[in-house]
């Protein structure tokens, strides 16, 4: 679920996903189009693609089971569909953490009018 994703980002990256990535670049937040603007925005692009491949459950609403210790996440889900959601969220949280140094404030609340280039395929 998106609520779990927020918590996971806090545990892995040490920052709020909603605050830092809720409306960032062309892909972080609702929707997504154009080209990712930087590495952090690409994390969101890849996460959107990952969610798009999930079949049989709802990535935004369905809950999964995971554990976290010292920033390491283990998806402990028996259901293959919700485990896939957990793995998508885990990869994005790690991506945010690993690319914090490329985060640029100019892409925070980036106007969608600048996201008009043709999107690349997932």
Curated annotation (Swiss-Prot):
Keyword Hydrolase carried by entry: yes
Family assignment from sequence similarity: Belongs to the phospholipase A2 family. Group II subfamily. D49 sub-subfamily.
Protein's name in the database: Acidic phospholipase A2 Tpu-E6b
Tissue expression pattern: Expressed by the venom gland.
Main location class: secreted
BP-aspect Gene Ontology terms: arachidonate secretion; lipid catabolic process; negative regulation of T cell proliferation; phospholipid metabolic process
PANTHER family: PHOSPHOLIPASE A2 FAMILY MEMBER, PHOSPHOLIPASE A2, MEMBRANE ASSOCIATED
Keywords: Disulfide bond, Hemostasis impairing toxin, Hydrolase, Lipid degradation, Lipid metabolism, Metal-binding, Platelet aggregation inhibiting toxin, Secreted, Toxin
Source organism of this protein record: Craspedocephalus puniceus
Protein function: Snake venom phospholipase A2 (PLA2) that weakly inhibits ADP-induced platelet aggregation when tested on platelet rich plasma from human and rabbit blood (15-25% of inhibition at 5-10 ug of enzyme). Exhibits moderate hydrolytic activities toward L-dipalmitoyl phosphatidylcholine. PLA2 catalyzes the calcium-dependent hydrolysis of the 2-acyl groups in 3-sn-phosphoglycerides.
Gene Ontology, cellular component aspect: extracellular region
Superkingdom of the organism of origin: Eukaryota
Cofactor binding: number and manner: Binds 1 Ca(2+) ion.
Gene3D superfamilies to which the protein is assigned, alphabetical: Phospholipase A2 domain (1.20.90.10)
Subcellular location, record wording: Secreted
EC number in record: 3.1.1.4
Required cofactor(s): Ca(2+)
Record note on quaternary structure: Monomer.
Active site per UniProt: 47, 89
């Amino acid at each position: 679920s998106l609520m779990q994703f927020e918590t996971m980002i806090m545990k892995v990256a040490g920052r709020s996903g909603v605050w830092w990535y809720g409306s960032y670049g062309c892909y972080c937040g609702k929707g997504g189009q154009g080209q990712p603007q930087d590495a952090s925005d690409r994390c969101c692009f890849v996460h959107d693609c990952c969610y798009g491949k999930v079949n049989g459950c709802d990535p935004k609403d369905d809950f999964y089971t995971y554990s976290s210790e010292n920033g390491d996440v283990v998806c402990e889900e028996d259901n293959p569909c919700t485990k896939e959601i957990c793995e998508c969220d885990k990869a994005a949280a790690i991506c945010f953490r690993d690319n914090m140094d490329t985060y640029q404030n100019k892409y925070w609340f980036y106007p969608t009018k600048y996201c008009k280039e043709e999107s690349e395929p997932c």
